[in-house]
């Protein structure tokens, strides 16, 4: 969950998000080192009047500044490709949930159950209870079992939407006429909030997403009560 004046990412709740945080730190370190080197060279150029004339034609220098950036790009690309393949990999999901974007709410269907569907609307500010979050609470939460592989099928009934939950490292476009999929695995129980992340009209900011991750026994009781 985000908090006021937060500068970093939300706490990782899935293996994918943990990998993304590590990749972010890895890349940020490379960017910091490159920026420091460039600033150091610029400061030297501005503070000295000496000129090394042979540097302009040095083949060794040209070789270094060609090979070194290539190595740096490889060091960035390889971890990125690994995470991309991990995000696309879906092996034997325990549960499949289909979500459809509408103007301006989400609908959910648990495809492993015969008749378990519902719509999820934002709760207006005037109806919020003490302790609830403005613009983030919904009337029907998406209850899912933790520590299990869940496949999310995402599409749209009207315009472009995007189903995003930052703490789980999820952001998948909901495109009319196309079915996208993503994997969801939570390592701990709790409430996880997200929002539509694609501008979709006047009420775009009123499309929150709330996932309630619970132990399997609690999920079985909830699903039985919904049928």
Swiss-Prot record:
Tagged with keyword Mitochondrion: yes
Disulfide bond recorded as keyword: no
InterPro entries: CcO_II, CcO_II-like_C, CcO_II_C, Copper_CuA, Cupredoxin, Cyt_c_oxidase_su2, Cyt_c_oxidase_su2_TM_dom, Cyt_c_oxidase_su2_TM_sf
Matches recorded under CDD domains: CcO_II_C (cd13912)
Domain of life, per lineage: Eukaryota
Physiological role: Component of the cytochrome c oxidase, the last enzyme in the mitochondrial electron transport chain which drives oxidative phosphorylation. The respiratory chain contains 3 multisubunit complexes succinate dehydrogenase (complex II, CII), ubiquinol-cytochrome c oxidoreductase (cytochrome b-c1 complex, complex III, CIII) and cytochrome c oxidase (complex IV, CIV), that cooperate to transfer electrons derived from NADH and succinate to molecular oxygen, creating an electrochemical gradient over the inner membrane that drives transmembrane transport and the ATP synthase.
Family note: Belongs to the cytochrome c oxidase subunit 2 family.
Known cofactor(s): Cu cation
Residues bound to Mg(2+): 198
Chain residues that bind Cu cation A1: 161, 196, 200, 207
Keywords: Copper, Electron transport, Magnesium, Membrane, Metal-binding, Mitochondrion, Mitochondrion inner membrane, Respiratory chain, Translocase, Transmembrane, Transmembrane helix, Transport
Cofactor comment text: Binds a dinuclear copper A center per subunit.
Localisation: Mitochondrion inner membrane
Listed transmembrane segments: 15-45, 60-87
NCBIfam families for this protein: CoxB
Mitochondrial intermembrane side: 1-14, 88-227
Catalytic activity as recorded in UniProt: 4 Fe(II)-[cytochrome c] + O2 + 8 H(+)(in) = 4 Fe(III)-[cytochrome c] + 2 H2O + 4 H(+)(out)
Membrane-protein topology: Multi-pass membrane protein
EC number assigned by the record: 7.1.1.9
Name of the protein in question: Cytochrome c oxidase subunit 2
Residues in the Mitochondrial matrix compartment per record: 46-59
């Amino acid at each position: 969950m985000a908090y006021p004046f937060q500068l970093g990412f939300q706490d990782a709740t899935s293996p994918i998000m943990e990998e993304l945080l590590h990749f972010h730190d890895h890349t940020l370190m490379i960017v910091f080192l490159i920026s420091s080197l460039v600033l150091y060279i610029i400061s030297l150029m501005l503070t000295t009047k000496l000129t090394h004339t042979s540097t302009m034609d040095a083949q060794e220098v040209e070789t270094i500044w060609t090979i070194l950036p290539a190595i740096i790009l490889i060091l960035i690309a390889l971890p990125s490709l690994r995470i991309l393949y991990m995000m696309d990999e879906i092996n034997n999901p325990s549960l499949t949930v289909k979500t459809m974007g509408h103007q301006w709410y989400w609908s959910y269907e648990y495809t492993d159950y015969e008749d378990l569907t519902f719509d999820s609307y934002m709760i207006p500010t005037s109806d919020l209870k003490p302790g609830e979050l403005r613009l983030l609470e919904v009337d029907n939460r998406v209850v899912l079992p933790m520590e299990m592989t869940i496949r999310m099928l995402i599409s749209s009934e009207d315009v472009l939407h995007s189903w995003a939950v930052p703490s789980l490292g999820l952001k998948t476009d909901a495109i009319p006429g196309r079915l996208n999929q993503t994997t969801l695995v939570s390592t701990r129980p709790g409430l996880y909030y997200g929002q539509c992340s694609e501008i979709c009209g006047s009420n775009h900011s009123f499309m929150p997403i709330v996932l309630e991750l619970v132990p399997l026994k609690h999920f079985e009781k909830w699903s039985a009560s919904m049928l």
